[in-house]
Every structure is written in structure tokens, then in C-alpha cells.
């Protein structure tokens, strides 16, 4: 299987999740460790995670070094529209996802693919003029293709930070779907597939007289709705529901 290297940012936590992610670097060194290892490794390709804040700081220099070395590496650049690790500030210089894509193309990256969340509002026609675009449900297929592509490739994953979504929705600055997901505890069997599919911290254990089930913490739910991809009939979708204020 494939492996990924970590870097500086929230995604560093993937190291602790037993998901074949290792090797954090200093800021701006993302992927450069692979440039030295590649000639002596039996592995042909790696992925490198890179946050948009680090990219804006010095990450592009590492990508340019990878292009110059002709390494087989795919940079997975998360554009979450915030310097999330330090409080959700805006990027210096108002960096945008389309600017990142344009810079990657100019730097000589062989193939750039934009991955997007279909629930977010942005000009998809504009992005399709810059690179190939695919919904996030196609991520695994795109990763498999890029892993077999020689040279430097990149995925720009465009999805706003979940914590920032909640903050902006409270101020009316971000689309707020009029829908909430609940779990019917009488149907739920506690298999946990919803958590496997969504990796969402809002799915909490619910102790019942029939054993442990699952419930959704509505106070932290960011309305991602990926939990409903779980193989389970217990989900209830409610339109117009609001959290009761104390």
C-alpha cells in the first residue's frame, strides 16, 4: 500500500491514527526528506500532506525542489481557508485555492487535480479552466491514479475548516444547510461504520439498556453529512431543526 508523510499543521495528528502516515518535517521541508530517501528505497512513490498555511509560508519551495529532482511524489494540499492551527486567521496576502493551482502549474507539477466539497459554494466552471476537478467522493480513485504517475503531482483539496464553518455560520457568513442528522437508537446496532466512513468526532457513544449505540452531538456537528455513508438504516434526516437554546 501507499504511505504518506506528515508536515506542520492540524494534519500532523494523522500520525497517531495508524494510517500509514509518518515522518513529520519542519515547516517548508515537506517532501524534501523523500528526495534524499528515494534513490535508496524500494518504494516508488509517496504522498506528502501539506497545509495551505505552510504552503503559503514556504511549502512551494519544497515542491519546486521535488520538481527539480524528478521525484515521484504527490502533494496533498489542504485548502481549508484558514490558518487553523493558530486560531483560524486569514492567510497573509489573501491566498486562494485557484492561486495555488496556478502556481503549481507554473512550477512544473505534472498533474494537478482539485478535489471539492459539493456542499460548498464556489465557481466550479472557473476552476475547471485551471485543472481537472473531482468531488471528494472520487478522492481514492484520484490518489490511485496519481500514485502510478511518474514525477511530481498534486491534489488541492478545497474544503473549509470545520471549526471555521461553525464560527462563520453563527455570524451568517457561511451557507447553513437547513438539515440535521440524528441516529435512531432503537435501530442502531452500535457497529461504528458511520464513524469509520466519516471519521467525525461528533459521533459519540450512547449507553443504553440494550448496549452501546451511537448518537450525534449536535453542538459540534458541522453538517458534513458524510456519516450517512455508513452502512446503516438508523439515520434520521430532519429539515428545519434547530438546537434548543438554554
Residue ranges and their predicted role:
Residues 3-85, 92-98, 140-141:
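Thiamine diphosphate
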Residues 3-5, 47-49, 75-77, 113-114, ...:
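Structured core elements
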Residues 11-20, 43-44, 80-88, 120-127, ...:
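Gly-rich Lys/Arg/Thr-decorated short loops/hinges at beta-loop-alpha junctions or inter-strand turns
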Residues 9, 78-81, 117-120, 159-160, ...:
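Short, ordered loop/turn segments at secondary-structure junctions
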Residues 82-173, 177:
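Glycine-rich ThDP/TPP pyrophosphate-binding loop and its adjacent helix/strand module
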Residues 159-160, 165-171, 189-244:
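Iron-sulfur cluster-binding cysteine motifs and their immediate structural context
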Residues 34-39, 45-46, 72, 82, ...:
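N-terminal export/assembly segments and adjacent metallocofactor-ligating motifs
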Residues 1-3, 9-22, 26-30, 218, ...:
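Iron-sulfur-cluster electron-transfer modules
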